[in-house]
Amino acid sequence: MGIATTRTGDRVLAAVGAGGNAKPEFESHDGVCNGGVLFLLPALLSQGLLKTKELYQIPATHYYGLESVLLTLAFMALARIKNPEQLKQCKPGEIGRLIGLDRTPEVRCLREKIKLLSGQNHAQELNRKLVDHWYAPNETEDRTEELFLYIDGHVRVYFGELANLPAKFVSRQKLCLNATTEYWVNDLQGLPVLMVTGELTEKLQTAIEGQIIPQLQQTILLPTPSQEPVSNESKPAEPAQSIVPGTEQPTGAVAESKEPAALPPLCTLIFDREAYDIPFFERLWDKYRIAMLTYRKNVKDNWEVNCFENIEVTVLEQKITMNLCEKKVTLGGVPFREIRRLTESGHQTAIITNNQQITTEQAAGRMFGRWCQENFFRYMIADYDFDKMIEYGVQAIDEKKEVINPQYRKLNHQLKKQKEKTVRLEAKLLEIVETAMATPVDQLPKTRIKECDLIEKINASRSKHKELFNEREGVTRKITLKDMPGQQRYNQLKPESKMLMNIIKMICYRAETAIANLLSEYGVSEAEKRMVVKQIIDNNADILPDTENNTLTITLHSLSAPRFNKAAQKLAQLLTSTDTFFPNTKMKMIFKTTAL
């Protein structure tokens, strides 16, 4: 049965369906490896780890029940055990003690459990339940605060051969590679909210309208416009011209009722230039009453420097003085507020929004705070093996979906290269002609030969370009998937298992962030707080159960510095006051540290 297997009777009973899933049973142990991860259990539970029980099931014939599997996956993620294969390098009995069993699931067993859960296809519903849990209103929370969400796509490169994926541009490697795109929604603190997977080469605005907004509308975050009562107390922000002198007055087209100033937006989406499209912005407001905030594209003019003023802006909880100016503009017949930041180099960064409720400094702070989402991606890639494939296999995509014809794309690429070749030859010919003007008369015949040779090559290149152009004219630009040849037809990697693991990692990241924020209140610096959380997770701990009083005491060993130990002591006191019970038991958890 494997190393550290001691509960053989329970395993046999579970196998024959008589005993059910194994219940946690703790024994006294000193110096359990990674025992500090139990300090994050209250945060994991508060972030909704056991919400999974409302949707997923594991049959009673399995020794490892749902709680045990969830705790194993969560503790693995927090301990930076990045995939089941790495369990081979760990002590199975040590991790087993953390979940109250004799040992951790074996690699194949854990993969089977992940496959079993993924086959139930509840990942998106689980994500929505967690959103309702994370952002449920409470008595102390100000529900009048406007909702802002960051949205961005994360490209996950695929190096395998089983799936036939379309090529996407990967900015990290500056190459076009076979990949899938995950679209993430984060809140203003950078915490993950929602995630959807793109099937083909969808644009960001397509993912927002087709997947993200429908998912959000099924949560408490984004009610439909008809469900949202309009408050008479909501007032738009002060006019832009009162902030900065010299601003432009709105034109007649802007002053019409088309301007979204009368109603507060249900939500403001913040994204980069990838989703820049004026009709898309207009649809978001008209159809969903959603405002947008993004960078403006194709800015060709510069505003007068004397229009800018130094304004204190809060970016990610830090006060920064920015040189800002705001004007009202009309783009494509649609009114917007344009805010520009003047940098020390003289560059003007342009931001546009149709949210009339927020101030200039709020708009700038939220736009430039978008890097918290990029920091989230970078942290997850480095610490949680964000791009790791969970399950091998592919599945078909709706054959009615349209894609760019691969033959059209190939011809288009050849046309581009042929045109570049022609331009290079023409530039070379121009250089020879200019040189010939200063060449002695007796050397002109040699130059003439070179000119004739280049002219011949240019004519041949132009003829080839014309042939390719005519060939492309006979090819349909877009085709449906069913019209693609079988070997070239696009499919997709199975998304359910990756989505489920992403949700578990969301919970872990939010739990880790919650503990890190508590540590910062106890004297740990912002630069060190996540490092201290990792140190707590990696540290050993003593486990002492008390069956008479139904308590489970977790004693963390000393950390690397006295100030960290002081913070850990205060954290232990707070965690104990939460009255957390270990899942599937009646044992109240008590947290202590060995440091004096």
Please state what every model-predicted region is:
Residues 1-175, 180-262, 463-596:
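Dynamic "connector" segments at or just before major functional cores
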Residues 160-162, 277-286, 302-307:
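A short acidic (Asp/Glu
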Residues 225-256, 286-373, 381, 549, ...:
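An anionic, glycine-rich sequence signature occurring as long contiguous blocks
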Residues 262-263, 281-291:
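Short, surface-exposed basic-aromatic patches at helix termini and helix-loop junctions that form
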Residues 269-279, 298-301:
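Acidic, metal-coordinating catalytic cores used for nucleic-acid/nucleotide bond scission
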Residues 291, 359, 367-403, 461-468, ...:
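C-terminal, active-site-flanking charged/polar segments
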Residues 380-434:
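Charged, amphipathic alpha-helical linkers/stalks
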Residues 425-472, 476-479:
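Extended alpha-helical coiled-coil "stalk/arm" regions
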